[in-house]
Each structure stands twice: as C-alpha cells, then as structure tokens.
Amino acid sequence: MAKPVRNPTEPLRTRHVFLDTEVYRRAAFNISNTPFALLAKQIEDGRVVLHTTDITLTEIHRQLKETAVAMAAEAKRLVRDFNRIAQLTGEDNVTVRDVDGSALGEKAWAGFVDVLVKRFRSHSVLALEVPARIVFDRYFDGRPPFDHRGSKEFPDAFIVEALARYCNSNEISMYVVSGDAALRKAAGEHDTLLPWRH
C-alpha cells in the first residue's frame, strides 16, 4: 500500500489569524480536538497569533448555551421515549440525572473561554466599538457583506471592519478563516485581511 502524499504547503503570509464563529461551531465548539490541538502547538511555538472579537465571543456564548439547552431537552425526550418502550418489556424505568441545560451552557462557556485565553492566548479585538456609520455606509452602498439583496450580515460587517482597523493600526495583516462566503468576500475588500476558506 502506497503512503499518502502530502501536498506541499506554502509558508504563512502572516502569523495573525482570526477564526469566524462558524469555524468553532463546525467543530461543535470542541476546541480541544485534534485540529485545535495542532493550532495550540503553532501558537505555543510562536508561529500563530489567534485573534477573536467581542462579537464573535458573544455569538459563541449564545450558541453554546442554545446547544446545551437543546441537548438537555433531547436527553429528557430520549429517556421518556426509552421508558415507554421499557414498559412493554416489564423493565424498570431508566433514571437519568436531570441536567440544567442553561447551567451546562454557562459551564461550557467558562471552559471555552478558559481554553481560549490560557491555551490559545487569544487577542480580543473590540468590534462593538466600530462606528456604526462605517458599517451602514457599506450597507447602503451594497458592498460586501451586504452585496446580496436582503442580506443581514451586520455582525460580520462590524467584525470585518474591526479586524481591518486593528490590522491598519498595528501595521499587520491577518487571515480571516471562515466557511461563510459573504464574510470572506467582505474581508477581501481590505488589503490587510486575507480571506481563507475553512
């Protein structure tokens, strides 16, 4: 059996990287998995600097909490359905510890932030401080991420603008990693941002 061939990789154009909420969501917010462990090693070795924004963190917090609440409700439903079937067999009902989905979500959030700060040494960019006028000008001009009719990409627009301002003020460039085409297109409008598809 032949060994798999690795495609050569190009060196990074910058060591600064921003991961969109979608990247974390796609990993089910498990930032201890193998790809994130590899990222942590790159950060530890000084090859990568991870950036996030206040908006991204708020989105992750909300989504983590929603996921935990949904999972707790699903667990209750599964136990109830299982016990209905078990009644037919004469088996005793299964008891499962009641899980407070909201509390679980908050604990998951605290763990997520702990890893993000301690292991990934993430730098936070304040997107909520971007003047709204800048984003609304893009919106009214129909520029990315608002180039599609009916687009509601306001959080992404603030994020991209904040990252571009951060890069300009620090004279750096930054990869913007996302599976969201509109966010990547908006990032591509700025010389300092390098869109990268996840």
Question: Language-model segments: which ranges?
Answer:
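Active-site-proximal, substrate-binding regions of enzyme catalytic domains
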Residues: 2-172, 181-198
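Conserved SAM-binding loop
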Residues: 176
